[in-house]
Amino acid sequence: WCLGSQYWGRIPHVPDYKARFGILLDMVGGKNATFYYEAFSKQTANNAMKKIWKMADHLGYSNYFIKEDGGQVTDDHVYVNQYRQIPCVDIIHYDTQSNTGFNPTWHTLDDSLENIDKATLQAVGQTVMGVIYNEK
């Protein structure tokens, strides 16, 4: 899992690369997707995570960005933090009602553009752009 982020974490594109924080967008376009506090993000990038959820609330997207704890996911953000010490937030739709924790189309042939929701992408995109734009 996460071979690209593990490689980049060990061998960054610029020697000694650092960033204030990172944002991982994973499965952020699904219909009726909601985004809870991911456990590893909360543990290692809590300040950045709070900025994101606060911006979503400010923009009127609190129905997408739920201020409650969600699951823990081993994903690229873990290795960005582990190898580069860059706090990284995973914005991910984690479905507690699913056997896998993810959308039923996850890793199937049905994981296609027909299952992407423009409103969800807009909520996530505008939130992330707001956070980036407001960084000093």
Whereabouts are the PLM-identified features?
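Active-site-adjacent mobile loop/cap segments within catalytic or ligand-binding domains
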Residues: 33-38, 46, 67-136
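Stable alpha-helical elements in mature extracytoplasmic
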Residues: 1-8, 48-52, 76, 124-127
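Acidic, glycine-rich loop-and-strand cores that form catalytic or ligand-binding grooves
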Residues: 43-65
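Short C-terminal domain-edge/linker segments immediately following a structured domain
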Residues: 23, 52-58, 120-127
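Sec-exported extracytoplasmic/periplasmic mature domains
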Residues: 10-14, 54-57, 61, 82-85, ...
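Short amphipathic alpha-helical segments, especially helix-boundary/capping motifs
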Residues: 25-30, 51-55, 101-106
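Hydrophobic anchor at the start of a short beta-strand
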Residues: 20, 63, 88-89
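Acidic/histidine-rich catalytic neighborhood of metal-dependent amide-processing enzymes
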Residues: 1-47
